[in-house]
Amino acid sequence: MFNLFQKKSDNSPRQIAIGDVHGHYDGLCQLVDFCQIVPEDRLYFLGDVIDRGPKSAEVVKWIRERNYPCLMGNHEVMLLTSFNNGDLDEMALRHWLPSGGDATLESYGDEGISQDEIDWFTSLPSYLDLGDVFLVHAGVDPFRSLDQQNNDQFCWIREKFLSNHFPYFTDKTIVTGHTITFTLPGVRPGELAQGPGWIDIESV
């Protein structure tokens, strides 16, 4: 199951980043209950809130009703590519559906994904800079400035980011999901992974 990263400073609300929910609405509710979330807490979702799990529609509804910030993940990118300007892209669908998109479509039932929801997915930011914490779904290209990057890097990058030996920022920590932590050397299932200037919380 997905994990979280939380930061608490004196006399300030908790900042809680939640990793790839992937349609697991019941697990999300359990995590929120376990953390004893209060209205003052600031929750941030790192993308990939849809696909694979059986309740993507419920996850999206829950996040939207509470107006929590949510980042673009590679699975949201696949959804949007499949719904290309309102028209279904058959080639993109053949890639998205086996990657968990079939479960997302099923969760929306006969009504399907509305244009309002497509607009919401489209509006998701690629990253959030919270000062000393930088939230992004997959990572950053260590050899490019932020303004030289797009969702190809922010939502999909893996080895190039994780294998870099130097922190991208000197004054903030990058928090990501996307890469399952126990696929990295020396990390056991359920553990977070850390590297130079980054923390990966996708500890399935």
Task: State each model region's role.
Residues 1-60:
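N-terminal active-site segment of His-dependent metallophosphoesterases
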Residues 56-129, 156-157, 161-164:
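Active-site neighborhood of divalent metal-dependent phosphoester bond hydrolases
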Residues 20, 48, 63, 73-74, ...:
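Divalent metal-coordination and catalytic microenvironments
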Residues 22-26, 51-54, 77-80, 128, ...:
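Active-site environment of divalent metal-dependent phosphoester hydrolases
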Residues 151-204:
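Conserved beta-sheet core of the metallophosphoesterase superfamily
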Residues 85-87, 139-156:
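Short, surface-exposed, charged loop/turn segments at secondary-structure junctions
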Residues 118-148:
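Active-site-adjacent alpha/beta core region of enzyme catalytic domains
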Residues 2-11, 36, 60-63, 126-129, ...:
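A short acidic-Thr-Gly-centered motif at the start of a beta-strand
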